Design a protein with these regions (language model features):
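Hydrophobic membrane-insertion alpha-helices, especially the h-region
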Residues: 26-47
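Second-shell loop/turn segments in exported
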Residues: 69-75, 127-138, 176-177, 203-212
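Short extracytoplasmic/periplasmic juxtamembrane "stem" segments immediately C-terminal to an N-terminal membrane anchor
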Residues: 54-76
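Catalytic cores and adjacent binding grooves of peptidoglycan-active enzymes
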Residues: 27-33, 179-256
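A charge-rich, low-complexity, intrinsically flexible signal that marks solvent-exposed coils, linkers
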Residues: 21, 107, 111-113, 242, ...
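Active-site acidic/histidine clusters and adjacent loop/turn architecture
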Residues: 73-160
Length: 256
């Protein structure tokens, strides 16, 4: 029941203990940083040619299967209006740029466009979205909605139904408080889906459905949205979201 006299110090002061490991780590950090910087310079200068999938400087491609660099390329593309619009064009998304506007206190949009169709699915009606939000929606449709519909329902998503996108209003339509991300065209409220075979699913009717395929698809749709949107709110969040997914790219983080 009694530990050896020095047992408590083993691993802390031994030749491979934490102090030694920390010293080794400090010695390696600078060479590693220099090596990475040199590698980045060679790639940027064209001396090392990588395939687009492994090139961190290649534009984000909606059609490309997500990999280790997807997050980096997605963030870089979202931050650059020209890259963002080019990525949507390559994906076959009908994104019609609209002039920047200020429509009220804390309301308006920049780098936005009117969008009515994604790569494979249409929107029930065209909406105005900021380009980064449209890009997230396009990637979401390609990599999560389509596969989820095939897996759970043996069909495809033909149309995305929604309750709107841009609107100059506060969060939850409150009379006072912070502006919603809808006020800057950085959010869309998705209320349902129409499949290629004509079936229609809505959050109101199918979120708690006894039909496991329908309910499973909607939960997979919610979980997939969390991969591309900073904030995804579903009926699990609160009663105000009983009939839609709130999807926004305004900078917050939530997946509920």
């Amino acid at each position: 029941r009694h530990a050896a006299p020095h047992a408590r110090n083993i691993g802390l002061r031994g030749p491979l203990g934490w102090p030694m490991l920390l010293r080794v780590a400090r010695l390696l950090i600078l060479p590693l940083m220099l090596a990475l910087a040199a590698l980045a310079a060679l790639i940027a200068g064209g001396q090392i040619v990588l395939t687009p999938r492994w090139d961190p400087f290649a534009p984000f491609d909606v059609a490309e299967t997500p990999g280790l660099l997807t997050r980096f390329k997605f963030a870089r593309t979202r931050a650059d209006g020209n890259l963002c619009r080019a990525a949507l064009a390559r994906a076959g998304v009908a994104f019609e740029p609209v002039p920047d506007r200020v429509t009220g206190e804390g309301c308006g949009f920049s780098n936005a466009g009117r969008i009515g169709r994604l790569s494979a699915a249409s929107l029930a009606s065209p909406v105005i979205l900021a380009c980064p939000t449209a890009l997230a929606l396009a990637a979401y449709e390609r990599h999560h909605l389509g596969p989820a519909a095939a897996s759970f329902l043996n069909s495809r998503v033909a149309r995305i139904e929604h309750l709107g996108a841009y609107a100059c209003r506060n969060i939850n339509h409150a009379a006072t408080g912070r502006r919603s991300r809808h006020a800057t065209a950085e959010a869309i409220d998705v209320s349902g889906f129409v499949l290629g075979d004509g079936r229609r699913l809505t959050l109101t009717a199918d979120w708690s459905s006894s039909d496991e395929a329908r309910a499973g698809f909607l939960r997979a749709a919610r979980d997939g949205a969390c991969r591309w949107f900073g904030v995804t709110l579903s009926p699990d969040y609160n009663p105000l979201h009983y009939d839609h997914f709130h999807l926004d790219t305004g900078g917050g983080r939530a997946c509920r």
